[in-house]
Design a protein with these regions (language model features):
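Structured alpha-helical subdomains that flank or immediately precede key functional sites
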Residues: 1-313
Length: 313
C-alpha cells in the first residue's frame, strides 16, 4: 500500500480511508484475545469521532503519553516504545512527520518498522477498537493525542492481529523499532561491571529495557510495587552524592503509566533526604506516573533480564 497515493485518492474523492487488509473486524483482533460475547461487542471508532480536536502528537512525544490498555498484554512493545521516545534519532524513522489530523486528513496513517533487514512502511486506517466504551489497547494519557494508539495498531497489523501482541519479547520490539543490534544480560548472573555498562549505554543513547520473572498473564504486583512477568523501560542512570559517598541509581518506567517501586530511592523514600536539594529537584518527579528510581543492588534483585539496543554493535 502506497501511503501518499492512497491519501491523495481519498482526499480527491472526499473519503475516509478504510483498510481492507486490516479491517475494522474481529479478525484483526484475533479469535482468542477475548471471550466470544465480548468480541461481538467491539466497536471501532476514529479519533475524530472521539475528540473535537484530535492530534497525532501534542507537545512532542514522551513515554508519559502511553498508558497500557486493560485487555492487551503488550508491555514488551510499550516498554520498547517508552525507550524509543527518549531517542529522537530512532523515533523519526518509525513515526513519519508527513501526517496528522489537521492538514490533508483522510483517516490514513503510516509507521515504519524494521523487518528482515529493511524498513517496512505499514499503512493503516485510524479506526480503533473499543470495548464497553474503553480502549481495548494502549490509550493516550492526554485524551486527544493518538500517536501511541495508532502506532500500536500498525504494529498489530505487521504482526497479523492485536492478539499477536499479547505476550512477546522486549528484545524483538527493540530491534523492530530501531533496526539495531540488541544484547541481553542476565541480572541473576550479572557482569561485574554492570554499573559501567549501564552508564556507557545511557551515554551512548542506547535503548534499554528490563523484565521480571513470573507469569505475565497474571499481572501480580508485589508488596514492593514491582509487577511480575512484566517489562519496564530503563530511562536513565546516574551517580549521585549520598551521605559521605556516592550512590548509583537507575530510573525505570512501567508501561501501565502508574504502579511504582516503593522501596529505597522510590518517590517518598527517606534516602532522598540525604541528597543535595538541587540534585533532588533535578531528579525526582513525585507523581504516580509509573516512573521511579532504585539502587543498582535492588535492580539486580528485582529484575531478571536487561536488554540494551543500539544501531551499531
Amino acid at each position: 500500500q502506497d501511503f501518499n497515493r492512497q491519501r491523495a485518492f481519498c482526499l480527491k474523492q472526499g473519503l475516509l480511508f478504510e483498510d481492507a487488509t486490516f479491517p475494522a473486524h474481529v479478525k484483526s483482533i484475533g479469535p482468542n484475545l477475548l471471550p466470544e460475547d465480548q468480541l461481538r461487542q467491539i466497536q471501532w471508532k476514529r479519533p475524530i469521532e472521539l475528540q473535537k480536536n484530535p492530534y497525532l502528537i501534542m507537545d512532542g512525544v514522551s513515554r508519559f503519553d502511553i498508558i497500557q490498555g486493560y485487555q492487551l498484554g503488550d508491555c514488551w512493545l510499550l516498554a520498547a516504545l517508552g525507550s524509543l521516545t527518549l531517542q529522537k534519532q530512532f523515533l523519526a524513522k518509525v513515526l513519519p512527520k508527513d501526517q496528522g489530523f489537521q492538514d490533508d486528513y483522510a483517516g490514513i496513517f503510516h509507521f515504519r518498522f524494521w523487518q528482515y533487514g529493511d524498513w517496512v512502511d505499514v499503512v493503516i486506517d485510524d479506526r480503533l477498537p473499543f470495548l464497553n466504551g474503553r480502549y481495548l489497547s494502549v490509550h493516550p494519557r492526554t485524551s486527544n493525542e493518538f500517536w501511541p494508539s495508532l502506532l500500536e495498531k500498525a504494529y498489530a497489523k505487521l504482526r497479523g492481529s492485536y492478539q499477536n501482541l499479547h505476550g512477546g519479547y522486549l528484545s524483538d520490539a527493540l530491534v523492530d523499532l530501531t533496526g539495531g543490534v540488541q544484547v541481553q544480560l542476565s541480572l541473576k548472573d550479572p557482569p561485574p561491571d554492570l554499573e559501567e555498562i549501564l552508564t556507557a549505554a545511557d551515554k551512548s543513547q542506547c535503548l534499554m529495557g528490563c523484565s521480571t520473572t513470573g507469569q505475565w498473564r497474571k499481572n501480580i504486583e508485589l508488596k514492593n510495587g514491582i509487577v511480575q512477568g512484566h517489562a519496564y523501560t530503563v530511562t536513565g542512570t546516574v551517580k549521585i552524592r549520598y551521605k559521605n559517598g556516592w550512590q548509583h541509581i537507575i530510573r525505570l518506567w512501567n508501561p501501565w503509566g502508574h504502579g511504582e517501586w516503593n522501596g529505597p530511592w522510590s518517590d517518598n523514600s527517606p534516602q532522598w533526604d540525604h541528597v543535595e536539594p538541587k540534585c533532588r529537584e533535578a531528579l525526582l518527579r513525585n507523581k504516580d506516573d509509573g516512573e521511579f528510581w532504585m539502587s543498582c543492588e535492588n535492580f539486580q534483585e528485582q529484575f531478571s533480564w536487561l536488554y540494551i539496543c543500539n544501531d551499531t554493535p
